Amino acid sequence: MQAGFAMLEVGSVNKKNTKNILVKNIFDACIAAIMWYAVGSSLAGGNGDDFTSTGENGFAGSGGFFRTVSTANKSAYAKAGWFFGWTFAGAGCTIVSGAIAERATFLAYALYSVILTGFVYPPVVHMMWGAGKFSAWRSGPRLFGDCGVIDFAGSGTVHMTGGVAAIIAAGCIGVRKGFPDALPEGQPVYQALGILILWMARRRRPAKAFTWACSTA
């Protein structure tokens, strides 16, 4: 998905900002891997909710920081799950890149990337896809009439998190210099290529989730 976002954003900005967009997308993937390894995977899917004395905070996991997979489960499936979590952390972070294109310094964007992939996105994953109180997979008490929430493909977990962060960032930064004077258009061919790549990257997850739901109904 990083490739899709990169092409979509490159096609949407002025040509002089192409290199900046590409560097930020590559940086997203790299910093997401580091932060997901250091703290993200533990906050998202750590062993239990033991940040409080009752053991029930329902918002973040803990334990096993600086890890790729659980020490009790090093199967290929667990490793694939870690890889999947890392790619979605990077994807959620990259959503903001397009929203503030041509308006943010690289240092400011780097700081945001560290915070979102390490400390904002992982608790959302825990609440929606882990053992958090929003999750339908939780064995204990759940919100929404004890039904919880099922997010098959990340529309809430990934895209809503990135979208809210993008709205906040765009609102804080404001319009670009020179607005409303139009800048030279980007390249529509890259926009189309990016959209097609994102479609292909996204289509497998909903199909697999739907198949699982049907098999357990």
Question: Which stretches of residues belong to each language-model region?
Answer:
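Hydrophobic alpha-helical transmembrane bundles of multi-pass membrane proteins
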Residues: 1-217
